[in-house]
């Protein structure tokens, strides 16, 4: 029986990892589109567009890295809006030297502020791409590539293969390039349509299991009806960094350059029992007759990373009746149509859309007012706490259900007794 269970578990993990299925965003992906805009003497000029169709997962600093393998002996003569990280061996070329001669080029976005003649539309953001649900206009990145020693017709062009995408770390798996109907463009005066000479798409999906072996965030709970605070589970994000963590009152925090990110993105975490870079706290704050109020706080424990354009996705049955969100922006997420139990919180632009590194300013918070559905609302059995929590697209570890702040058994009895006492005093005063 144990052997059968183990087999089923590993089979499920393989399927889950291979399909990279996210139950709260089942159709989320990053689509990379190549549009050949013109032919050249020995190849073509193509516009490469990366569209992030993930509702609440974005690519943050240090940005995306795109790679592929050329099918033949192609080279990159030039690029606009991006660059390869290595030129490779171009010694066989005399006169004009290509931008890149590697069989497997690696491409990154340009940084903001580059000269105008190096810029392209939707480029030069340091590889940062917003989430589609947060801001569709920011969920795109583009560059132009001029390929040489390639085909010069639709029949002679060979599609690149073995696409890879880092965003910024591992986790994405890309499928093969597929020829699709040519993209149609509308001129600026909107009176004429043009189309690409040839178009192919590459679809990349994300799997948290491939990205890391431990969660990157955890969740803690508290409530007004119980003094118990349910903390994040111990070592929720693994304790590998326990030896290199820094205490909150350590003098090393005054050292200059402490917050400068490392090239390998090694974190510098504050010493905690959970050792997570980010903690989400859900506090059931107030109970009204027709409404109830929750306070959400996000705390950063990483001294070397801040989070731009952060997102927080939460699944809770009462999110179908959100009345007001006070300090965050909010959008409902309904991946299954009629089931409206998931929402995405994110920072208000120019106010709290940047979660600073660990320290006094390393937190953002907001309160949420929800209307009660009297048929389902209860404080019993942990109903008031979320079912799933995602920060920046990665699922956070929740405490075990038996540790949730419980509603005292005598709460309802005490309330009834209190109400009876008030009525009795009122009756005596009138009498």
From Swiss-Prot:
Recorded superkingdom: Eukaryota
Membership in a protein family: Belongs to the COBRA family.
Protein name per Swiss-Prot or TrEMBL: COBRA-like protein 4
Lipidation (GPI-anchor amidated asparagine): 414
Gene Ontology cellular component terms for the protein in this record: plant-type vacuole; plasma membrane; side of membrane
Compartmental location: Cell membrane
Propeptide: 415-431
GO terms (BP aspect): cellulose microfibril organization; plant-type secondary cell wall biogenesis
Species assigned in the record: Arabidopsis thaliana (Mouse-ear cress)
